[in-house]
Curated annotation (Swiss-Prot):
Pfam families the UniProt entry points to: ATP-synt_ab (PF00006), ATP-synt_ab_N (PF02874), ATP-synt_VA_C (PF22919)
Gene name in the database record: atpD
Main localization of the protein described in the UniProt heading: membrane
Catalytic activity: ATP + H2O + 4 H(+)(in) = ADP + phosphate + 5 H(+)(out)
Compartment(s) where it occurs, according to its Swiss-Prot or TrEMBL record: Cell inner membrane
Secretion signal span: none
Subunit structure: F-type ATPases have 2 components, CF(1) - the catalytic core - and CF(0) - the membrane proton channel. CF(1) has five subunits: alpha(3), beta(3), gamma(1), delta(1), epsilon(1). CF(0) has three main subunits: a(1), b(2) and c(9-12). The alpha and beta chains form an alternating ring which encloses part of the gamma chain. CF(1) is attached to CF(0) by a central stalk formed by the gamma and epsilon chains, while a peripheral stalk is formed by the delta and b chains.
UniProt family annotation: Belongs to the ATPase alpha/beta chains family.
Organism listed in the record: Blochmanniella floridana
Enzyme class: translocase
Membrane topology summary: Peripheral membrane protein
Descriptive protein name: ATP synthase subunit beta
Record-listed ATP binding positions: G154, G155, A156, G157, V158, G159, K160, T161
Length: 464
């Protein structure tokens, strides 16, 4: 057994000295027993640097309270390993795979290391099958494919977590798929609400939850995304189509910044770590679909100060197949989900993938909304009367389209007072086509607000 001694503690970074011929490898896990009189704690460290002179620098995967120089450290001779397989479904784990839901141990047959290689090029799948979410604005304007990577961009409080909760609910119930949810540096309250929402929806047994909340050390928040991804990779390799939800990628970046500063690395632009692109690439390249199964990833990405040019969101952009931008201006109008259809984009919005009709209707919706944006200044200064008849019609239809893009969510029923709605792709396309064609020009625009299909809008108009 390889034993070392702690020689320095700087916050979450610990230096350990070993015998010169027994130095741990990078990413090896080390174990420290901390005895504080009444309590006993086992702390796991991960080797991230070899400093020379038989000293390794580690990051702590837990609180360093009670650590002191001279404590013995055991080299476990392997990386951090977490339980994988169906035994993880319905359970809440921390970064080390330990259960934190007070339901007893996870009796998993297998444990996998959280540091793994991305699949080889010949193993990758090029399948282009659409994944229907039941959310109109997403299915029409920025469709997903199985095995795609989707980014939910938005500032504070515009609905990233609620959108993720609705996606998990819809896909678990309508598609009967497995999901892995990773909470990276988010609020404990949100994690608790999310857990109880999964119980309320009856889909907890189809979701594995991995939490590294914002009160935890940076090491936990940096590695928890890899823990969740490892669990998802196991499901994929067993032939399942699995969904991986990460909330929030920005906190993953921020944890990397904290660790980088503690390790003494020179910072890059805006204070981010100089290895930002590499760390992001190592995570994103593992989120891949193979010929065995698929991992479809939905990642919430906080945008600092609503600035999309910040290095953190821009580094993430390069890896995504679809970007869904949540707008504060649209949220201010009371339209939820607050997706901006003009800023959002999907590589899958292609006639070869979605079909010509879907492609044409999505483009028509975009052009009508874009024209409405251009006319807003004229309306504000001169009023509607100065517009041509054609422009008046565009404004009328665009306001209906804008409201029809809203939708009541199942997970938000208690807040909105509207019953949740899942809308098929066929109903979505048909509804927008009929609005564009002017079939519902006689209906009040308010009848299209917070409804599912266009049939619900017709029924609503009868009571307005």
């Amino acid at each position: 057994m390889s034993i070392g001694k702690i020689i320095q503690v700087i916050g979450a970074v610990i230096d350990v000295e070993f015998q010169y011929n027994d130095i741990p490898n990078l990413y090896h896990a080390l174990e420290v027993n901390i005895d504080n009189g009444n309590s006993h704690q086992v702390l796991i460290l991960e080797v991230v640097q070899q400093l020379g002179r038989s000293i390794v620098r580690c990051i702590a995967m837990g609180s360093t309270n009670g650590l002191k120089r001279g404590l013995d450290v055991t080299n476990l001779k392997h990386g951090i390993q977490v339980p994988v397989g169906k035994e993880t479904l319905g359970r809440v784990m921390d970064v080390l795979g330990n259960p934190i839901d007070m339901k007893g141990p996870i009796n998993s047959i297998e444990k996998w290391s959280i540091h793994r290689s991305a699949p080889l090029y010949e193993e990758l799948s090029s399948n282009q099958e659409l994944l229907i979410t039941g959310i109109k604005v997403i299915d029409l304007m920025c469709p997903f494919i199985k095995g795609g990577k989707i980014g939910l961009f938005g500032g504070a409080g515009v609905g990233k977590t609620v959108n993720i909760m609705e996606l998990i609910r819809n896909i678990a119930i309508e598609h009967a798929g497995y999901s892995v949810f990773v909470g990276v540096g988010e609020r404990i309250r949100e994690g608790n609400d999310f857990y109880h929402e999964m119980i309320h929806s009856g889909i907890l047994d189809k979701v594995a939850l991995v939490y590294g909340q914002m009160n935890e050390p940076p090491g936990n928040r940096l590695r928890v995304a890899l823990t969740g991804l490892t669990i998802a990779e196991k499901f994929r390799d067993e032939g399942h189509d699995v969904l991986l939800f990460i909330d929030n990628i920005y906190r993953y970046t921020l944890a990397g910044t904290e660790v980088s500063a503690l390790l003494g690395r020179v910072p890059s632009a805006v204070g981010y770590q100089s290895t930002l692109s590499e760390e992001m690439g190592m995570l994103q390249e593992r989120i891949a679909s193979t010929k065995s199964g698929s991992i479809t990833s939905v990642q919430a990405i906080y945008v600092p100060a609503d600035d999309l040019t910040d290095p953190s969101p821009t580094t993430t952009f390069a890896h995504l197949d679809a970007t869904i931008v949540l707008s504060r201006q649209i949220a201010a109008l009371g339209i939820y989900p607050a997706v901006d259809p003009l800023d959002s984009y999907s590589k899958q919005l292609d006639p070869c993938i979605v079909g010509q009709e879907h492609y044409d209707i999505a483009n028509n919706v975009k052009s009508i909304l874009q024209r409405y944006q251009e006319l807003k200044d004229i309306i504000a200064i001169l009023g509607m009367d100065e517009l041509s008849e054609e422009d008046k019609l565009i404004v009328l239809r665009s306001r209906k389209i804008q409201r029809f893009l809203s939708q009541p969510f199942f997970v938000a029923e208690v807040f909105t007072g509207f019953s949740g709605s899942y809308v098929s792709l066929e109903d979505t396309i048909a509804g927008f086509k009929e609005i564009i064609d002017g079939k519902y020009d006689h209906l009040p625009e308010q009848s299209f607000y917070m409804v599912g299909s266009v049939k619900e809008a017709i029924e609503k108009s009868k009571i307005l």
